[in-house]
Amino acid sequence: MRPDGTRVRDLTAIMQALPYVMPKRYDAQNWAEEYLDEDAIRDYIRAKRREGRTVTHMSLLVSAYYRAVLKNPKINYFVMNRRIYKRNHFCFSFVILKTRADGTPDETSLKVYLEPDDTVFTVTEKIRSTIEKNQNVRHNNDTDRFAKFAFGVPGLARAVFGLAGFLDRHDLLPRSIIELSPFHTSQIGRASCRERV
């Protein structure tokens, strides 16, 4: 059993066949373009800020998507090795830009886990505290340390990531590695540099 999900067995024959018909990620990838009323979003954010409550665009969109996942859990399914799994949590990854001690820019990936009772305000706080903790110049999160280790020795990255891929395909990848990976997630987003948290 995978640490990040359980196999879905009560699928129709068509659903079970889809990973075979579309075996590559790009075969089944869905892209959607949605236009939102930005004025309504800005008005909501301003109204909440006047009340003394901080809300960001990112936290608002993540919260809305999470509510959709709670109403339709199949959105949070994933495919590994042509088998369909139900993710046993909701998390989202995003990348932030931070500055190194020498002043050069660097980026790091972050992962935030949500609970069913989270609101737009608790999501905002979780994002803010995660960014704040990881913007420290001297702070490297576990993902940064793992990447530095993997790329520290020539040829090691290929072996490390090859082994991780093998373990993942056979449902043996440890939870600790899944928690490090920004790609084992329900949603990947990006934080705008103009957005104030």
What residue spans do the PLM features occupy?
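C-terminal catalytic/motor cores of large multi-domain enzyme assemblies
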Residues: 1-197
